[in-house]
Swiss-Prot record:
Its cofactor is Mg(2+). PROSITE patterns: NDPK, NDPK_LIKE. ATP binds at residues 11, 59, 87, 93, 104, 114. This is Nucleoside diphosphate kinase. The gene is ndk. The lineage of its organism: Bacteria, Pseudomonadati, Pseudomonadota, Betaproteobacteria, Burkholderiales. It comes from Cupriavidus metallidurans (strain ATCC 43123 / DSM 2839 / NBRC 102507 / CH34).
Length: 141
């Protein structure tokens, strides 16, 4: 198994519910280390740039509006198969379809307000981690 890094965002709905610590506990219980973290209130420009891959999709405006609606917690996670582990922890995009015990089943309200974002592949993980944590402020341990 390879040690990977992935990006995770705890979205405004989950931050507002005060479940950051519960989500972090799940990362750590799965063997993932938080190697960089920050709480930010994304600007519209940052959200549009980060989600630019979805620009032509009908949900783009609503996604950006949601992501700028309140603060988010952004973290880089590291561990064996970190991308797949994080995606398993998150559950299906639609919380109604997510397995019990996943972050989205437990904390998300809808497919739009779905609590968390996670990178879907090594290539996107590298781009996403670099977007929010450029330079040397990621710390392996």
């Amino acid at each position: 198994m390879a040690i990977e890094r992935t990006l995770s965002i705890i979205k405004p709905d989950a931050v507002a519910k005060n479940v950051i610590g519960q989500i972090y506990a799940r990362f750590e219980a799965a063997g993932l280390k938080v190697v960089a973290a920050k709480m930010v209130h994304l600007s519209r420009g940052e959200a549009e740039q980060f989600y630019a891959v979805h620009k032509a999709r009908p949900f783009f405006k609503d996604l950006v509006d949601f992501m700028v609606s309140g603060p988010v917690m952004i973290q880089a996670l590291e561990g064996e198969s970190a991308i797949a582990k994080n995606r398993d922890l998150m559950g299906a995009t639609d919380p109604k379809k997510a397995e019990k015990g996943t972050i989205r089943a437990d904390f998300a309200d809808s497919i739009d307000a779905n609590a968390v974002h996670g990178s879907d592949a090594p290539e996107t993980a590298a781009v996403e981690v670099a977007f929010f944590f450029p330079g040397m402020n990621v710390y392996s341990r």
